[in-house]
Regions:
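Short Pro-Gly-centered beta-turn/loop motif in secreted/extracellular proteins
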Residues: 1-7, 93-105
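Structured interaction patches on ligand/partner-binding surfaces of diverse proteins
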Residues: 1-40, 110-135
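Core hydrophobic positions of leucine-rich repeats
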Residues: 175-183, 202-213, 224-234, 246-257, ...
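Short, acidic Ser/Thr/Gly-rich low-complexity loop/linker segments typical of extracellular
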Residues: 72-94
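Extracellular/surface-exposed low-complexity segments
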Residues: 30, 130-136, 288-338
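Structural signature of tandem-repeat unit edges
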Residues: 159-167, 188-201, 211-223, 233-245, ...
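Structural motif
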Residues: 50-68
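Beta-strand-rich domain onsets/edges
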Residues: 36-51
Length: 338
């Protein structure tokens, strides 16, 4: 029983578009009648020479799973670096089939946001099922948000992941700020890695002055409002790989910021030299930040009449003289991500 495979020239080969390790590969003994007219396979005595890993996460979401030291079901070759693109079912489960070695590491991500990392302390056993928790707290109302953050802090969690409604707005983000204000005595500055999944926009002032934040991951956000992360002074990393619109001073007032990952920008407000740029005022426009942009990002040109940066049609990374300058700022480096 091997749904991912087909017979071809007397051998089992992967079907087109299928990847080893994403479905069962059960071997049973076949009994063939003397005249060859009937074949009986006893699956009650079939062997599973591999284990099953159930990944529990959000329903109907695409995830990527990266594994080292892993042998997929149906294969005898151990993979040192295997990456899978999976989609969870309606119950939030995704499955892998194979053998994980001692110290095998499994990392689950939703877009660029890490959901969990697990290292096996011993090799998995054949015919045995294992479960990996990559769940995210769903919090749609203000009260649910405050309760979730309070509970995560009480459980000494520093990686807080919330699944918000796509139209989450001022009420929900006020609740996030209030929740961190309420637990301030139990949270050290610059210790929280916050992931917000589902929401499409960070409103103006949405997450400003949150000293608890060390990093923030916004995999679904397409718009970031004015002063959205203003004076998050201990923030070291911002990852918003799908953002296209950013308003004035969205990231201004930082001290520790080192890495920023953005989507393909088409609409950016504010001019760097006037202090209205997205990173606020800097010394001569210099930033000690490594900036990551998608490979298709275009050069942005400032329109003084509209006070807005717009794409020119020229690919940024094809330009011979970009020299790590973007939106009027000089970065430590500007690199492309795919």
């Amino acid at each position: 029983y091997a749904p991912n495979y087909k017979w071809e020239a007397g051998k089992l080969v992967l079907k087109e578009g299928k990847v080893a390790g994403t479905d069962e590969y059960i071997e049973g003994k076949a009994n063939i009648t003397p005249n060859g007219q009937a074949i009986t396979v006893e699956f009650s005595k079939a062997t599973r020479n591999y284990s099953r890993l159930r990944i529990a996460t959000m329903p109907n979401k695409p995830i990527t799973v990266t594994i080292d030291r892993y042998t997929p079901a149906g294969s005898s070759d151990m993979k040192w670096d295997q990456k899978y693109a999976l989609t969870s079912d309606e119950k939030g489960n995704a499955y892998l089939y194979g053998t994980f070695e001692n110290n095998s590491e499994v990392t689950v991500k939703y877009r660029e946001a890490a959901l969990t990392t697990h290292t096996f302390s011993q090799a998995t056993e054949s015919a045995k099922s294992y479960a990996l928790d990559a769940t995210v707290i769903s919090a749609n109302s203000a009260e649910e948000i405050k309760s979730a953050i309070k509970q995560e802090v009480a459980n000494s969690k520093t990686a807080i992941r919330l699944n918000l409604a796509s139209d989450a707005g001022d009420n929900e983000f006020n609740a996030i700020r209030e929740a961190f204000k309420n637990v301030r005595g139990n949270v050290q500055d610059g210790t929280i890695d916050l992931t917000l999944i589902g929401c499409k926009e960070i409103p103006a002032d949405g997450l400003k002055e949150l000293n608890a934040l060390k990093s923030i991951f916004l995999p679904d956000v397409t718009k970031i409002g004015m002063n959205a992360l203003f004076r998050c002074v201990y923030l070291e990393e911002i990852c918003a790989p799908n953002v296209s619109t950013i308003d004035e001073r969205a990231f201004a007032g930082f001290i520790m910021l080192e890495k920023v990952t953005l989507g393909e920008l088409t609409d950016v407000r504010g001019e760097a030299n006037s202090g209205g740029g997205i990173f606020g005022v800097t010394d001569n426009g210099d930033l000690n930040i490594d900036l990551y942009l998608p490979k298709n990002q275009e050069v942005m040109e400032f329109d003084e009449n509209q006070y807005i940066w717009k794409p020119t049609g020229e690919k940024y990374f094809a330009s011979p003289d970009y020299d790590n300058i973007f939106l009027g700022y000089q970065f430590m480096s500007v690199k492309k991500w795919e």
